[in-house]
Amino acid sequence: MIFQKKRKTAETELSIILADDKRTSEINTGVGFLNHMLTLFTFHSGLSIIIEANGDTEVDDHHVTEDIGIVLGQLLLDMIRERKSFQRYGVSYIPMDETLSRAVVDISGRPYLSFNATLSKEKVGTFDSELVEEFFRALIINARLTTHIDLLRGGNTHHEIEAIFKSFARALKMALSENDNDNIPSSKGVIE
């Protein structure tokens, strides 16, 4: 399945394609560190992403990072609504050398993010560490997921953020995988 959205505001202009196939991802956010994290996300989630983004990065990376999270969340919601079968729940622990991150995902239709991660430094290169939570909040709310992200052990800030992205990607992959009953895993029969 292939899903595409464009978003244009006074601050950003985005074109994003999300697919659950093996196409090559092409990520150009204008923010080097975010490109790196999203590349890792695609590898570990099994999803393909093509992003072309322009934003007011001369101000900072906030708007483009948050808007990419918004649009990716909307595309994930579109994908979830098209699927007739998925596991619903996913959990992943990822070590990255001295760091350890846990992500738990419920495709619930009830948007909630618990982000329990005190990152060691305020920046990785020029990227503000606080934007990691902003990205995930935008994605989770728009995808209507219940998600808990916990940084259990820290150290190097790059490693901390990388472990967070990888653990979320792996938990999402598990939650999106087909279930044995070929149905929506809810006693209500629907997830909205």
From Swiss-Prot:
Pfam family membership, one: IGPD
Keyword Transferase (UniProt): no
Record key words, sorted: Amino-acid biosynthesis, Cytoplasm, Histidine biosynthesis, Lyase
Keyword set includes Lyase: yes
PROSITE patterns hit by this protein: IGP_DEHYDRATASE_1, IGP_DEHYDRATASE_2
SUPFAM superfamilies: Ribosomal protein S5 domain 2-like (SSF54211)
InterPro entries reported in the protein's UniProt record: IGPD_sf, ImidazoleglycerolP_deHydtase, ImidazoleglycerP_deHydtase_CS, Ribosomal_Su5_D2-typ_SF
Compartment annotation: Cytoplasm
Protein's UniProt name: Imidazoleglycerol-phosphate dehydratase
Origin species: Staphylococcus saprophyticus subsp. saprophyticus (strain ATCC 15305 / DSM 20229 / NCIMB 8711 / NCTC 7292 / S-41)
